[in-house]
Amino acid sequence: FPALAGQKDLCEMVAFCDIIEERAKAACEQYGVPGAKYYVDYKELLKDETIDVVHVCTPNVAHSPITVAAFEAGKHVMCEKPMAHNTEAAQAMLDAWKKSGKKFTIGYQNRFRQDTQLLHKACEAGEFGDIYFAKSHAIRRRAVPTWGVFPNKALQGGGPLIDIGTHALDITLWCMDNYKPVSVVGSVYEKMGHSALAAQGNMVGEWDPETFEVED
């Protein structure tokens, strides 16, 4: 919200929605333009014909249904990454977007970093020749998110791979011209999440090892 609120020449934040009314009201009062509204049901928000763009910032499991509904309501959509918690939900988003004729983007802000822009331009110019192999890495030590529902697999769908790994994969695929994979193989593991000792050394607060459900 603060970043968007600071772009007053580009957008106006006219409506907010949260299933917890107090949060929606607080965000509306702090970041909204005069006369901004707040809702507890996104379906009611989507009925407002004055809204042009919807920014989806919910737990991952809700990305797809809200995005699909927004397209059906004639809105442009920016959705936070990852697109969804599974491929079926992501495909539903793509199908709704193509049918709507509206604009759609995922919150991969690292594409706009200066170093990433430089790398992408070099790849486009052919400075690295024919790129046929690439590795991507994402490391964040002892910084497991402890806010919201991050360790809840049902609501988030996964851990660091869809949290920070997705940024590394996006930049890699983007620089390689977003080719279409023939097949995908992956694996994850978990160990630290269930360790009380690891939880105590976290940079952004501790978590309950008993409720940690995603890979780490």
Region roles according to the model:
Residues 1-32, 172:
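N-terminal Rossmann-like dinucleotide-binding module
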Residues 14, 36, 52:
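Conserved acidic residues
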Residues 16, 54, 134:
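Receiver (REC) domain switch-region micro-motif
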Residues 21-22, 103, 137:
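Catalytic cores of eukaryotic secretory-pathway lumenal/extracellular enzymes that build
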Residues 35-42:
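Conserved SAM-binding strand-loop segment of SAM-dependent methyltransferases
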Residues 53, 59-60, 64-111, 126:
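Beta-strand-loop-alpha-helix segment that lines the small-molecule cofactor/substrate pocket
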Residues 110-213:
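Predominantly a Rossmann-like dinucleotide-binding segment in NAD(P)-dependent oxidoreductases
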